[in-house]
Amino acid sequence: MKMVPRLAVRAWPLCGLLLAALGCVCASGPRTLVLLDNLNVRDTHSLFFRSLKDRGFELTFKTADDPSLSLIKYGEFLYDNLIIFSPSVEDFGGNINVETISAFIDGGGSVLVAASSDIGDPLRELGSECGIEFDEEKTAVIDHHNYDVSDLGQHTLIVADTENLLKAPTIVGKSSLNPILFRGVGMVADPDNPLVLDILTGSSTSYSFFPDKPITQYPHAVGRNTLLIAGLQARNNARVIFSGSLDFFSDAFFNSAVQKAAPGAQRYSQTGNYELAVALSRWVFKEEGVLRVGPVSHHRVGETAPPNAYTVTDLVEYSIVIEQLSNGKWVPFDGDDIQLEFVRIDPFVRTFLKRKGGKYSVQFKLPDVYGVFQFKVDYNRLGYTHLYSSTQVSVRPLQHTQYERFIPSAYPYYASAFSMMAGLFLFSVVFLHMKEKEKSD
């Protein structure tokens, strides 16, 4: 009877453990670090954190000054997402600082930041890095015309109308929302930063100032320039959201009734905070609005394979597959404004792609110009990741055997040449056969 070596017998349990561990790693969701002022925030904002856990996020809760904090180890990011619910932090613990968080964003990480009137310098510096400027500490957004009936008299418990939301369903959700309850610090966007998104703005009667002091100078933010929630999508598709209110994500604001303190104002049994918070988290953590390029093909019409080089004026067909991430699965993207450019230095052809089946395609005639060209799709729309595809091809001139023998526009020149030849022939015949008469004596 053949004996099995002891080493092989012992190796089987070890392999099983390794496979089990690998399965656990693969099954885990996006790794998310949550920084809190204190761990009590985990209980006061439990509904928001529960919505993340229900969607498969792996949350790690730590205080913002924990000395063991680290985002990067051996050049690798330890987390996919970062949530900062610690507005009053003065110094992050461990290896985390504003520069580290900026590097995390530059590496494609997603960050959700919630501030308050007790905002510390680190969040202010982080906002400046992203084109957002917070107002001073102890200031708040004030609106004497759009405050809640439960406000204590300072008019800082703001009722924000959904008309002030950014018109981008991918970011703020597609369903209609009840009014939003907000209490926190105001922000303004850097006008020189085109990447900043004004997700939720104050009304025309809002402003940001110290609620317990008389106004002696022009407020930091006034009217619709007052940002309550702002976003940013970097050129590397990293996403960041800044909320001026930590209470915006709290269970108390999620479950609170809302009614403006104005005669005849409608009362709502619940705010729209929860729905908006979930929609914002889905966008910032790249569950929504994520596009990718699938297979790309191009060939002459009537053929199936791309040639080594195209010829000027060829009729070609270009196809591209574009997919969108939806509920964790890649599905065909539905868009009617995707354009294709055929570019050498400048575009020679720009045309819309039409959806056909699960891909987008178009047929067009190549320009009568030879050189090195690119099929280019550059799709950049609000709320979606930047989609870019470029395929380089060569376009050569006609071979000498491919030119037309006779060009219609040259028929007059042909006629003049042949008529000249015929005239010369007739003249030659007449001249050669003409004989002078002999003179008589």
UniProtKB/Swiss-Prot annotation:
Please report a single Pfam family linked to this protein: OST48_MD
GO MF entry, a single one: enzyme activator activity
Enumerate the subcellular locations listed in this protein's record, separating them with semicolons: Endoplasmic reticulum membrane
- Signal sequence residues: 1-28
Q: Give TM segment ranges.
A: 413-432
Family note = Belongs to the DDOST 48 kDa subunit family.
Q: What is this protein called?
A: Dolichyl-diphosphooligosaccharide--protein glycosyltransferase 48 kDa subunit
What organism, scientifically named, is this protein from? Answer: Rattus norvegicus
Which gene is annotated as encoding this protein in its UniProt record?
Answer: Ddost
